[in-house]
Structure formats: structure tokens, C-alpha cells
């Protein structure tokens, strides 16, 4: 099954997450098909905290990819952010 989930990067105590499309059997930070965005939970000031390629997200969802609960929450947050 293809899933869209977060892969952790960054340094110790400074997490940075890539939003990736991958096979559910792959490891969290392992091989992925495509990177469609990122989430930086420690962004400060004018730094961009969340970016999602909405067209690629829609493409993968139309091909049957499932969102992880965290990614679903972030996508909803991104949509509200774009509307405001």
C-alpha cells in the first residue's frame, strides 16, 4: 500500500520532517517515491513552517495513497492557512 507520511530529518533536538510518498513496508526514513512537502515544527520568525505540493498530493490520493493521521492534520492546517 502506498502511504503519504513524514520522514524525520534534521539534527538532534531540531526535528525537520519531509512529507514523502512511500510504500508502507519501507522504514520511516527509508526509500521513498517522491517528496511532496516539508514540515518544520521549530520554525521561528518568518521561516516557512509547512509547505505542501497540493497538486502532487491530489495526484497521489487519486491513485490510492493513504494519508497518515499526522499528514492529514497538517494538510488540513495548510488548507486553512491558505484560505486565511
Swiss-Prot record:
Keyword Endoplasmic reticulum: no
PROSITE patterns, A to Z: RIBOSOMAL_S16
GO MF term set: structural constituent of ribosome
Superkingdom field: Bacteria
UniProt keywords, alphabetically: Ribonucleoprotein, Ribosomal protein
GO cellular component, as recorded: cytoplasm; small ribosomal subunit
GO-annotated biological processes: translation
Pfam families: Ribosomal_S16
InterPro entries: Ribosomal_bS16, Ribosomal_bS16_CS, Ribosomal_bS16_dom_sf
Similarity section: Belongs to the bacterial ribosomal protein bS16 family.
HAMAP family: Ribosomal_bS16
The protein's name in its UniProt record: Small ribosomal subunit protein bS16
Species annotation: Dechloromonas aromatica (strain RCB)
Name of the encoding gene: rpsP
